[in-house]
Amino acid sequence: GVPMKYDVVIIGAGPAGIFTAIELIRKGANKKIMMVEKGQPIEKRRCPKSKTNKCVNCKPYCHITTGFSGAGAFSDGKLSLSPEVGGQLPELIGYDVAQKTIEYADSIYLEFGADTHVEGVGREEEVKEIRKRAIKAGLRLVDCPIRHLGTEKAQDIYYAIEQYLIENGVDM
């Protein structure tokens, strides 16, 4: 056959690969992009566990952890909107840059259909009481607003993103 020529090949269609492709498109890179993923497109990912009530160790790969959007497609879809949780990103790139990056990623989820409601904000008095109890117990309470996508909604959002990438010339 005819050899295919790409400017950029993205290995893996998890969140990092997805956002890389979105950024290339939006920054006007004008590149021919191929995204390689060993799993299925989001709309073809099915887990037999819902029928069998047990994991059957699917071969060659698990449809829950592998495929477009990675394991996130079948989680409960919670996005932590604070750099206070989830790793060392603030130490690596600075707190303000980490917060701006989280807000930017969140704006993309909103654009593709995420609910605008954010959990964990607007209950300052209750949080203040819980914080006092945590301190007394030797704990540190971390405020972390959460955008809850929900499992079904997460799949809809990732499907919309997948279609956006395809419509913008990304080969998968």
State the predicted function of each range:
Residues 1-3, 168-172:
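Short, intrinsically disordered, charge-balanced linker/junction segments flanking boundaries
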Residues 4-16, 34-36:
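Beta1/beta-strand and adjacent pyrophosphate-binding region of the FAD-binding site
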Residues 9, 32-34, 71, 171:
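Structural motif
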Residues 10, 15-18, 41, 49:
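Generic N-terminal leader segments that precede the first folded domain
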Residues 10-12, 20, 77, 161:
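Conserved structural-core and active-site-/substrate-pathway-adjacent residues in large, well-folded domains
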Residues 21, 25:
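Gly/Ala-rich phosphate-binding loop of Rossmann-like dinucleotide-binding domains
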Residues 26-31:
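Conserved S-adenosyl-L-methionine
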Residues 38-169:
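Conserved N-terminal/central alpha/beta ligand/cofactor-binding core
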